[in-house]
């Protein structure tokens, strides 16, 4: 607590719920087993006597270096521990729901309030483990198959996705809502937790690259401690603040220039990125989320779909104008409107197999490749959509800290989720993206300023610019209080103290009671 007070931290107990969600199942494993699993993993950050060391391969692993740097800043206050690290983009641990349920039952049965005289306040240490690390363990990595079928065992038996098999044909547009997205309120995200959960949305198996064809596949159904920067809600990794949030590299952080005043910004959408999300190929690229989003906010692509294909594009399908009742489409067609307010493009089409350049023979005719735009230049626009890549998007924290408004769609969980409130700190978006038009219509309106009778200055029909600014300002102000580097340090310190407790033979009696003495 002293560490947090010295850094002027906002401490709300709910901010740390993710720690206990992640660690609870490990009470179902013997501490000695957890310690040996952690010690013998291939990629490990170890703390001994307040200093950190890294075990890795010879490959350059920038994430390992960044996480080690973060851990080292708080290591002097931590006990000896081994922290296994997931160096891949993709989540790697998904334990069957039934197994996790049994592990949680053990935690509930064994954790009790302990009388003060019985509390142990010192960790046991790892001297015996260092002297005898034991044999390497085999997580039994699954490296073949369809990830949807591998992952859905992590869904509860009564969830919509549990018994739905993976798709094998990914030609044509993905499954799209025929009306308002499920679990929405009048077409807009009402429950952010549900909106991100693949267990509740079987259609994601055919519309998100994670389930179509991830970049790499190395997953286990075996519970062991593995730390990473993001995970699906059904995965069992232990979340750290992502390494890209700790870096000062302006490519991800946007630097300390967070954009100018709202009134000086371009009233429109900007998005730049690579065509990541998995291995997009000739036979499946139409099912990838970034390709779909770029197409759906491209005025020309939308005009072609409207005029030539009854609203159906190669990788999306438009809803009827009568669904969201947009103000803009009362004055012009959807494509024309988008041409005036949206600017989204890839900087690399990332072919599989690779072409050796930024182009791709099977998507070149659909997408224009543009130059990289640094985040500081993107901050000149009011609206910043953020879309999953191979996993989470590393730009989200930078967007939240900017004076622009983040519009977020994701299926990934991060360390800070309980700190951020949708519609207060950011605008949530459904992973089908069918609500993007309604979102922009509400905030931007027609995009055309006209002088109305009795008004001092031109106004935009249907626009709610002040409401957009209010959310952007609230998100920035809150991020500057709870998403600082200091807040990441505090989270990691508490996480690793609790993790060390789970690894300790005396864990049921281990506790902090100095405040009671």
PLM regions with names:
Residues 1-374, 509-516:
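Secretory-pathway glycan-assembly enzymes, especially type II membrane glycosyltransferases
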Residues 372-516:
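Catalytic binding pocket for nucleotide-activated donors in carbohydrate/polymer assembly enzymes
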């Amino acid at each position: 607590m002293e560490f947090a007070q010295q850094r002027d931290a906002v401490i709300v107990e709910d901010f740390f719920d993710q720690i206990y969600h992640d660690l609870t199942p490990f009470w179902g494993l013997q501490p000695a087993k957890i310690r040996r699993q952690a010690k013998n993993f291939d990629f490990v950050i170890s703390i001994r006597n307040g200093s950190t060391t890294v075990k890795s391969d010879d490959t350059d692993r920038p994430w390992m270096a960044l996480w080690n740097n973060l851990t080292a800043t708080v290591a002097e206050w931590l006990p000896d521990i081994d922290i296994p690290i997931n160096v891949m983009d993709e989540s790697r641990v998904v334990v069957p729901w039934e197994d996790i349920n049994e592990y949680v039952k053990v935690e509930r049965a064994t954790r009790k309030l302990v009388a003060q005289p019985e509390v142990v306040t010192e960790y046991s240490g790892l001297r015996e483990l260092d002297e005898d690390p034991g044999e390497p363990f085999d997580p039994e990595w699954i490296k073949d198959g369809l990830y949807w079928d591998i992952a859905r065992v992590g869904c509860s038996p009564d969830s919509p996705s549990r018994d739905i098999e993976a798709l094998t044909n990914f030609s044509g547009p993905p499954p799209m809502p025929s009306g308002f997205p499920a679990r929405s309120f009048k077409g807009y995200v009402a429950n952010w937790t549900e909106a991100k959960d693949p267990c509740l949305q079987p259609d994601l198996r055919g519309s998100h690259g994670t389930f179509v064809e991830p970049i790499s596949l190395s997953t286990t159904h075996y519970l062991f401690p593995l730390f990473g920067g993001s995970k699906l809600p059904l995965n069992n990794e232990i979340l750290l603040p992502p390494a890209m949030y700790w870096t000062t590299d302006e490519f991800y952080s946007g630097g300390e220039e967070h954009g100018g005043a709202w009134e000086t910004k371009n009233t429109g959408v900007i998005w730049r990125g690579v065509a990541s999300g998995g291995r997009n190929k000739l036979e499946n690229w139409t099912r990838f989320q970034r390709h779909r989003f770029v197409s759906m906010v491209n005025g020309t692509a939308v005009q072609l779909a409207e005029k030539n294909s009854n609203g159906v594009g190669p990788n999306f399908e438009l809803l009827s104008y009568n669904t969201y009742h947009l103000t803009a489409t009362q004055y012009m067609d959807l494509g024309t409107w988008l041409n005036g307010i949206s600017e989204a493009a890839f900087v690399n089409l990332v072919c599989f197999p690779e072409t050796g350049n930024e182009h791709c023979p099977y998507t070149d005719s659909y997408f224009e490749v543009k130059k990289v735009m640094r985040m500081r230049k993107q901050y000149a626009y009011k609206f910043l959509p953020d879309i999953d890549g191979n996993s989470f998007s590393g730009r989200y924290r930078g967007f939240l800290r900017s004076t622009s408004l983040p519009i977020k769609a994701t299926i990934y969980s991060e360390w800070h989720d309980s700190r951020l409130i949708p519609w207060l700190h950011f605008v949530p978006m459904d992973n089908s993206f069918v609500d993007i038009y309604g979102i922009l219509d509400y905030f931007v309106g027609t995009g055309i300023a006209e002088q109305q009778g009795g008004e001092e200055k031109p106004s935009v029909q249907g626009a709610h610019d002040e409401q957009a600014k209010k959310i952007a300002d609230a998100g920035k102000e809150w991020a500057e209080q709870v998403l600082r580097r200091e807040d990441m340090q505090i989270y990691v310190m508490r996480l690793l103290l609790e993790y060390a407790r789970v690894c300790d033979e005396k864990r049921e009696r281990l506790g902090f009671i100095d405040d009671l003495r």
